[in-house]
């Protein structure tokens, strides 16, 4: 099977337009996540390589945030070494990244990535929150702030763009949804191109 390109996926979306409104599919479809967890992703854009399949088998995304993280970790070379840390965090719950969970708002900012700093937007939100803390709160959490800001500075060049990878994940998810739920239509399209 020939690998899917972005233009092919857009053509697939047009191909199924009479059957389903791809813009309104649920993002919690169990059949789709089962397909992704099995790495049955031939014909699913950005998830067809052996490397991507390996990462899917390891992470086994159960929701959209985990799929976004999986794609960000797989497709950002500077983030890929962190995939094993992410796996440990994902599997060992509750996980407390050193000092990151001491400040409630920081914990909330990182909840979509299981408490791990993955995205530039998370770093920006953390910096913003720290800048709005009272002097008393800054003194109370001084050590946590020091460790958090040091970690952000250390990882600055490796962090991914959350909005970019969320958009990519949505594109991949919709492609996988069609394969999982409209299998005959999917293969009809695949064989016709």
Residue ranges: model-predicted function:
Residues 1-160, 165-193:
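Mg2+-dependent phosphoryl-transfer active-site scaffold
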